Amino acid sequence: MPNLKSTPHLQATFLLLIAMLSLQSSGSLAKVLFDQFPILTVSAMRLLLGSIILAVLFKIWQVDFKQVKYKAILSYGFALAGMNLLFYLSIARLPLGIAVSFEFIGPLSVALFYAKQRFDFVWVGLAILGLVLLFPFDQAAQPLDPLGIAFALGAGACWALYIVAGQRPSGVSGNHTVCLGMFVGMLILMPLAVFSGLPTNVF
């Protein structure tokens, strides 16, 4: 019989693995799209399609918008928009593995800041060791674009803000928080994408 106390941790680990797989695979797909569409267009359309899918999946129309804490949603959406855009800008200038390694400094910093128990530091150390083992040193031997590194670090900072903002009470469920935050992120990026010629590049 499974240990009921461990079930949520197993589920969280499983969902985390899926999330990381989706993140990295979407980065690879995005690099292909950069040949046909501006980076702003790709980032904005990703958030647009994501917000529509989540709105239908989690029935966003059932949300009591009077209960929504909009400051929390705005900070979450801003972090999400910055994380997506800056990450895409970084992988346009850097190899994917190197960009991800720099970006991971953000969430690792959050984990280190909130670490309280001995095992918390052990897990952070193992994560850093994993990054070192997976780091593409052969690609790093070539000159790296400083602006690409800056974009990756900026994406990591937004990722850290995304984690912290996601812990703040938003007045709605976690699923609806993600949906509304993604919609806010789309609203932030879409005007910039339209200004850069989204309708022409998409349609």
Task: For each feature predicted by the language model, list its residue ranges.
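Specific alpha-helical transmembrane segments that line the substrate/conduction pathway
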Residues: 41, 48, 88-118, 155
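Loop-to-transmembrane alpha-helix entry segments
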Residues: 67-69, 98-103, 113-134, 142-149
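Hydrophobic transmembrane alpha-helices of multi-pass small-molecule transport proteins
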Residues: 54, 105, 119-138, 155, ...
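Membrane-interface helix-boundary motifs at transmembrane edges
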Residues: 62-69, 109-119, 164-176
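Membrane-interface helix caps and helix-loop-helix hairpins in membrane proteins
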Residues: 88-93, 116-117, 137-146, 168, ...
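Specific transmembrane alpha-helical segments of multi-pass solute transporters/efflux pumps
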Residues: 58-99, 131-133, 202-203
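A helix-boundary/kink motif common to multi-pass secondary transporters
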Residues: 38-39, 95, 173-174
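Glycine-/small-residue-enriched transmembrane alpha-helix faces in small-molecule transporters
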Residues: 1-41, 75-78, 82-86, 129, ...
